[in-house]
Amino acid sequence: NKKRLWVGTNKGLCVFYGDSIIADAHNYKLYNYENGDLPGYEIKCIFRDSQNRMWIGMLGGGFSVCNPSEDYRNLKFVHYSTTDGLVNNMVESIIEDKTGKIWIATQYGLSRFSPDTETFENFFFSASMQGNVYNEHGAAITEDGLLLFGTNHGVIVIDPLKVTSSPMTRNVILTNLKVNGITVQVGEKDSPLTQALSY
């Protein structure tokens, strides 16, 4: 953007203007874990969204976002990881759908991120574990808004308008009951249980 180049390396993110680096090979800025700018070293993907924000996916560091300024040497990043709700910190590709949501494909699962609310929804579209392992730079969007993601088992095609999140509900199962720190059984004197807990 604006002749600025963003290069992902295994040492971090390198940002520079193409013409200036020809004149001076040291005229660039390296953002990485060592200098405290990013939560990781190895950059797996770089994506510019419709708002011109830059999304940086890292191996083990989750992802970071910045609004590029003219001064490429002082970019400020906001970082997101599993602590914030991302499905996995090994980010492989990032893409935006037509509604402005950001999809983050990882080495185990897919996250849909809402930049406005900074919330995540996580998905596992394959019944097999290997089918939920996404490929590096393996994301694309079609003209009609379908998202394509490369996985270890082929391509997953997603219509973002039809994907709904269904909260998982889990049944509570009691396996043991203690009263005043002592396990009680059915049939014992003063036991509150009239039948086994498994019923």
Task: State each model region's role.
Residues 2-5, 15-17:
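Sequence-structural signature of mature extracellular/luminal beta-sheet repeat domains
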Residues 12-14, 111:
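Structural signature of outer-membrane beta-barrel domains
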Residues 20-47, 58-61, 65, 71-101, ...:
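Residue-level "micro-hotspots" composed of small/polar
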